[in-house]
Amino acid sequence: MSEVRVKENESLDSALKRFKRQCAKAGVLAEVRKREHYESPSVRRKKKSEAARKRRYK
């Protein structure tokens, strides 16, 4: 979980900017999008193999 403490004499905008940067770096939004809908294990395996095939032939 990303956590940002607002420093003395720091504007809320800059603290929010730091928080957003930390979330992006941690991959929070990507994880949320990935888990938005349930994927069965067979679908996950299929996507993983297709991605590997794409990387190999690119």
Curated annotation (Swiss-Prot):
GO cellular component, one term: ribosome
A Pfam family of this chain: Ribosomal_S21
GO molecular function: structural constituent of ribosome
Residue ranges, compositional bias (Basic residues): 43-58
Keyword line: Ribonucleoprotein, Ribosomal protein
Chain residue ranges for the region called Disordered: 35-58
Organism domain of life: Bacteria
Similarity field: Belongs to the bacterial ribosomal protein bS21 family.
NCBIfam families: S21p (TIGR00030)
Name of the protein this chain belongs to: Small ribosomal subunit protein bS21
